[in-house]
């Protein structure tokens, strides 16, 4: 991963704001680069946290040493728009397209902002490759057609998320932008080859959060809501339900942009890091004024 070569001092001062000319370096494998967003009770960014206001635990232990701490404002947007076109969500597809179109208009505003569109059912299809062109993204959203990705029936959500994080986000710089997926689905998966853990793990590797616009499940006993909550919470994202409210949708998009554009970067050496590929659980908390801290649930140690 990449991070700015700007070191916080030992007195716990507020995070530095790197300028455009900051030097970048590649983080060694025995260091962890953690990005997170802090917001107050009103959902507004808290961009003045000090290092000594944070409590970080890596597998239950504080880090051996913090090497860098700064706030990165105006991160470039890297968005993957994933549209569920299976039969169970067909009634929601037109509304989902409208929201996805707003994402293109609202979030792709800077020359460095980019997005792709992936439609999925039993199989998945990239209907628009990476681009910063709002019109091209909107066209890719319109090309998410109900049933086209379902020649055999069924829905493979986990496989679609895996593909997005492995093949799309896996090919871009994980630390140079605010990476996230916007997933439109009811969460019902009955056709994936991989499981939800593989999807989550792959997104954690790619430093990619998942934001969900949830459709109501067809069955009351559906596992869909649980699946969507796990995908979002484990990657530092959210689940939204305000699909029918124009004001609610606007607020949801404001939250997504605030969380992805304004990020803290914390680079540290864990107390214990063996090169065994094991999962490290991250717990991060801050002062009361930072009511929500959006951070992924953990990371994987190097395998060798």
Describe each PLM feature range.
Residues 2-304:
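Scaffold/interface architecture of coatomer-like assemblies
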